[in-house]
């Protein structure tokens, strides 16, 4: 059984490496680095506080494209977790720096140690355009083979104004550091964004190398 899992991990690592190689050589103009730092801790048995910071660096423009802070509280009921959060985003568009404020509700359900689903309902308060609701649905699957080294796969779709506007697919590794509250999660992410005009619908693609640093108390 262990040999079978080891074979699967080798294939996943090979795919991850090939994706990264393809991005690095072929798609520099659509390549970004995302860094995430989040910290969470329980204040009671079923109540958790969380803070997150993320930035996105664009190699196309050689600058930080956007950053955000996100904080809130979640409550766990058996396999269901409900959370209320607030996000503040700053993004560069051409020569301007614009802001967006985004309260959101999260509903997560953990079926087992491998499969988890999350639904997010967010209200986008934009500086330069109309405010709008957006819905996000993410499925996560992990191979829990060892205690501190587990590959994972995620797919998240974004729906706004009854249309699919974005899709994110990611493949990575969850690394736990023994005897500490720290985790490191490097991953490759492919993001597809809908581009619509009066008569046509097109999609643009962004390749991302994402590294997340997590602390859980």
Question: Where are the language model's segments positioned?
Answer:
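Bacterial Sec-dependent N-terminal signal peptides
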Residues: 1-33, 217
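Start-of-domain marker
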Residues: 28-85, 90-92
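Residues that define the transmembrane beta-barrel architecture of outer-membrane proteins
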Residues: 31-35, 65-69, 99-103, 131-135, ...
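Repeated loop/turn-to-beta-strand initiation elements of outer-membrane beta-barrel proteins
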Residues: 43-51, 79-84, 113-117, 147-151, ...
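Transmembrane beta-strands of outer-membrane beta-barrel pores
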Residues: 53-59, 77-79, 86-92, 111, ...
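Ordered, amphipathic secondary-structure segments that act as subunit-interaction surfaces
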Residues: 94-118
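Outer-membrane beta-barrel "beta-signal"
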Residues: 107, 173-179, 205-217
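Detector for outer-membrane/organellar transmembrane beta-barrel domains
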Residues: 110, 114-157
């Amino acid at each position: 059984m262990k040999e079978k899992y080891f074979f699967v991990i080798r294939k996943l690592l090979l795919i991850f490496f090939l994706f990264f190689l393809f991005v690095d050589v072929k798609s520099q103009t659509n390549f970004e680095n995302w860094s995430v730092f989040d910290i969470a801790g329980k204040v009671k048995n079923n109540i958790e506080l969380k803070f997150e910071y993320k930035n996105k660096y664009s190699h196309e423009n050689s600058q930080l494209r956007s950053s955000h802070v996100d904080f809130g509280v979640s409550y766990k009921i058996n396999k269901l977790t409900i959370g209320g959060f607030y996000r503040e985003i700053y993004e560069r568009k051409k020569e301007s720096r614009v802001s967006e404020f985004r309260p959101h509700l999260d509903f997560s359900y953990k079926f087992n140690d491998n499969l988890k689903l999350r639904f997010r309902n967010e209200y986008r308060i934009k500086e330069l355009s109309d405010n709008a609701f957006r819905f996000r649905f993410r499925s996560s699957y992990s191979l829990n083979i060892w205690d501190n080294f587990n590959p994972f796969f995620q797919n998240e779709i974004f729906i706004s104004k009854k249309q699919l506007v974005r899709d994110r697919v990611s493949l990575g590794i969850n690394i736990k550091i023994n005897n500490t509250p720290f985790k490191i999660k490097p991953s490759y992410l492919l993001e597809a964004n809908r581009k619509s005009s009066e008569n046509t619908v097109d999609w643009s693609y962004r390749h991302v190398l994402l590294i997340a640093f997590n602390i859980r108390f």
